[in-house]
Structure formats: structure tokens, C-alpha cells
């Protein structure tokens, strides 16, 4: 079958015929999503990526159609595979939560230990499949990254139970959250935080482009240019830009006492200057800093439900989510979009 192949730790990408055997029901892949992790692997920038027998099938975002009945699913169902699998040894993995793997030996589809989903067919166990409602067929590919954010917000709220965090009226309306980064992840974080009732701010080191302005207007989120001085403080900050450690150094002091700082993704450049004064500020203000990564099956189901809700609540934004569709037969364009993000991009899909 045809597949998109990489050879980590080296750079480069190609479309090749491969023979990969698998267990479980067959799934015909209809489309894949492209994210920053895929591009880091293609460009040889992700040290965690590993080859299997000399190559690796790329991709951890996929939508497919089930080709046979299972215990709980039926032939013809739209399904999405979970991208992280357990090590099989630690307690969390054995209890279905490999997002908290204790050995660090979890498998990541299209990244390490497991071939990815950018291929014509896969076979997979039913327990790793999530049924996709037909009503969100056009934007369902967003559920995989959104699942990671569902888990992230769940984690933030759980951690902040260390104090009384809800407002006097029982909502989160009085809690201000700043998101750094206006890409796919930043926008999805903004939508999710608005759904939870937070007062949401989103930021970048520039002014918003036209598409971003339309989205932020519909979401009723406020915009901050990080190149300018920011005189406000926030109850939580989510770093979703992955641009450099200077963003963390710039925004961490903006947290209020008892604040939460979540880091999603990987900073590409820089060194964080942890002076004694910097660390004292974290201690005296009782700041919590948490790395945010990977949602599991319950979070993907939550993501599906939120996408259904948002098609009604935020119709303009959801209609702009898919920036481009690229056919697997257009190899030249495929290599371009797998290597570099285009300006104004939210999500690009590969169509099989």
C-alpha cells in the first residue's frame, strides 16, 4: 500500500509502497491532518522520532472508515484511531492512561515505536478507535489535537482545586486566561476555554491577520500584542506558540498569585534564565508550572461533542478551520505542506 515515509533522525519525506501487517479490523484511511510535530520530523528537528526497521510511516491524525463489524462498531462507521499506546508495564498504561506513562516507553503513532497513520490502510484494535459522528465529518480531523487540549484544561482545573478557583457565582467568568500563540492549538484552546466560561485573551508578537481577527471577534476573545507592554495580570497562562523560551520569560511574571502556567508543545529556541529572583517569584506567588501533552479516548470523545456544539455556536470559525486539502497524488504540494507552515494556516488535510 501507499504510505508517507520518513527516516528519522534524518530530514526528508517520500511517498512509497510498503507492506505492514497489523492486528484488528481493517480501516481505510480517508484523510490525515498535518501538525507541527509532523513537520519537525520531516525537517529532522524532533529528537524523539525513531525509525522502525529503517523507516517510519508518518502521521498521528487520521480519519477512516471501518471495513468490518466489531463488538461495538459497525462496518461503514467513521472512526479515528488514538495515537498514543501504553508501555504495557506501568500502572497508568495498564489502566488505559498512557498519557501518564511512568516508564517513558509509550508508543506514539508516527513518532516513536509505532508506524503512523499516513497510509492507505491500517488495522487496529477496537479499544483504540473512536466513532466519529457524521455531522462533523468535515472538521472531525480537529478532534485529535482538541483531545489533547481537553485533557489539558481538565488538568488545569484539577490542579487549581488546590484553592477555591471558581468565582463567587460558581462560574469561571472572573478568571482571566492568556493564550500565547494564534495557530491551530491557540485557537482551539480559546474555543475550549470560552466554552468553560473563562475570560479569554490570546496573543502573538504581531497584530492579528484578517482570518484571526474574524475568529477572535466571533469567539469574543481579546487580543494582546506581546511586542507591546502588557499591564494586565492573569489567573492562568497557556503557552501554545512553541516559538522560543523568551515567550515564557516574558509572560510568566504576568501571573497573579496562585496562578497556573501550562506549557503545550516544545520551545524551538532559547535558554530560560532561571535566576534566584525568578525562582523566588514562583515560590512566593505559589505558581504552578505544568507540561501539557496527549489526551486519551475519553478526551477524544469530549472533543467530538465540542465540535458538534461549535458548528452551531461558532459557525464562522468552524468553517475556516480547514485551510487546504491536498491530494495524496499531488506529491510536489504534499512535500511543501509537510515541510513548512503557510501564513494563515489553521489545518491542512491530506486526502486519500
From Swiss-Prot:
Reactions this protein catalyses: D-glucose + NAD(+) = D-glucono-1,5-lactone + NADH + H(+); D-glucose + NADP(+) = D-glucono-1,5-lactone + NADPH + H(+)
Q: Where does NADP(+) bind?
A: 182-185, 204-206, 264-266, 292-294, 341
Swiss-Prot/TrEMBL GO biological process terms: non-phosphorylated glucose catabolic process; protein tetramerization
Cofactor, free-text remark: Binds 2 Zn(2+) ions per subunit. One of the zinc atoms is essential for catalytic activity while the other has a structural function.
Query: Which InterPro entries would you find in this protein's record?
Result: ADH-like_N, Glc_1-DH_arc, Glu_dehyd_C, GroES-like_sf, NAD(P)-bd_dom_sf, Zn_alcohol_dh
List residues binding Zn(2+) 1.
35, 60-61, 144
Cofactor(s) needed by this chain: Zn(2+)
Q: Tell me the domain of life.
A: Archaea
Looking at the keywords, is Methyltransferase present?
no
In which residues is substrate bound?
A: 37, 83, 108, 144, 148, 294
- UniProt keyword annotations, A-Z: Carbohydrate metabolism, Metal-binding, NAD, NADP, Nucleotide-binding, Oxidoreductase, Zinc
Q: What is its EC number?
A: 1.1.1.47
UniProt-annotated binding residues for Zn(2+) 2: 87, 90, 93, 101
Molecular function terms, GO-annotated: D-glucose binding; glucose 1-dehydrogenase (NAD+) activity; glucose 1-dehydrogenase (NADP+) activity; NAD+ binding; NADP+ binding; zinc ion binding
- Say which family it is in: Belongs to the zinc-containing alcohol dehydrogenase family. Glucose 1-dehydrogenase subfamily.
Q: What does this protein do?
A: Catalyzes the NAD(P)(+)-dependent oxidation of D-glucose to D-gluconate via gluconolactone. Can utilize both NAD(+) and NADP(+) as electron acceptor. Is involved in the degradation of glucose through a non-phosphorylative variant of the Entner-Doudoroff pathway.
Q: Which HAMAP family match?
A: Glucose_DH
The protein here is known as: Glucose 1-dehydrogenase 1
- Per the UniProt record, the source organism is Picrophilus torridus (strain ATCC 700027 / DSM 9790 / JCM 10055 / NBRC 100828 / KAW 2/3)
Amino acid at each position: 500500500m501507499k504510505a508517507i515515509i520518513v527516516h528519522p533522525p534524518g530530514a526528508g519525506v517520500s511517498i512509497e509502497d510498503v507492506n505492514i501487517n497489523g492486528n484488528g479490523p481493517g480501516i481505510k484511511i480517508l484523510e490525515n491532518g498535518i501538525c507541527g510535530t509532523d513537520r519537525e520530523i520531516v525537517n529532522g528537528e524532533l529528537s524523539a522520532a525513531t525509525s522502525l526497521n529503517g523507516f517510519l510511516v508518518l502521521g498521528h491524525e487520521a480519519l477512516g472508515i471501518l471495513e468490518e463489524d466489531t463488538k461495538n462498531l459497525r462496518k461503514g462507521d467513521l472512526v479515528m484511531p488514538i495515537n498514543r499506546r501504553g508501555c504495557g508495564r506501568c500502572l497508568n498504561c495498564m489502566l488505559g492512561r498512557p498519557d501518564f506513562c511512568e516508564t517513558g516507553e509509550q508508543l506514539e503513532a508516527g513518532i516513536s515505536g509505532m508506524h503512523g497513520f499516513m497510509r492507505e490502510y491500517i488495522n487496529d484494535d477496537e479499544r483504540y478507535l473512536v466513532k466519529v459522528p457524521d455531522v462533523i465529518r468535515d472538521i472531525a480531523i480537529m478532534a485529535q489535537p482538541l483531545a489533547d487540549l481537553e485533557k489539558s484544561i481538565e488538568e488545569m482545573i484539577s490542579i487549581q482545586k488546590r484553592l477555591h478557583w471558581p468565582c463567587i457565582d460558581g462560574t469561571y467568568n472572573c478568571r482571566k486566561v492568556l493564550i500565547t500563540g494564534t495557530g491551530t492549538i491557540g485557537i482551539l484552546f480559546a474555543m475550549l476555554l470560552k466554552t468553560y466560561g473563562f475570560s479569554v485573551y490570546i496573543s502573538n508578537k504581531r497584530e492579528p491577520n484578517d482570518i484571526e481577527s474574524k475568529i477572535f471577534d466571533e469567539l469574543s476573545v481579546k487580543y494582546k500584542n506581546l511586542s507591546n507592554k502588557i499591564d494586565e495580570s492573569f489567573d492562568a497562562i497557556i503557552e501554545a506558540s512553541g516559538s522560543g523560551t523568551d515567550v515564557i520569560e516574558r509572560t510568566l511574571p504576568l501571573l497573579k498569585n496562585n496562578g497556573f502556567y501550562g506549557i503545550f508543545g516544545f520551545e524551538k529556541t532559547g535558554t530560560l534564565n532561571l535566576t534566584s529572583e525568578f525562582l523566588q517569584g514562583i515560590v512566593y506567588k505559589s505558581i504552578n508550572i505544568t507540561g501539557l501533552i496527549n489526551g486519551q479516548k475519553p478526551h477524544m470523545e469530549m472533543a467530538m461533542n465540542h465540535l458538534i456544539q461549535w458548528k452551531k455556536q461558532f459557525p464562522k470559525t468552524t468553517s475556516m478551520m480547514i485551510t487546504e486539502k491536498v491530494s495524496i497524488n499531488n506529491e510536489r504540494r504534499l512535500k511543501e505542506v509537510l515541510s513548512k507552515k503557510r501564513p494563515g494556516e489553521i489545518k491542512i488535510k491530506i486526502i486519500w
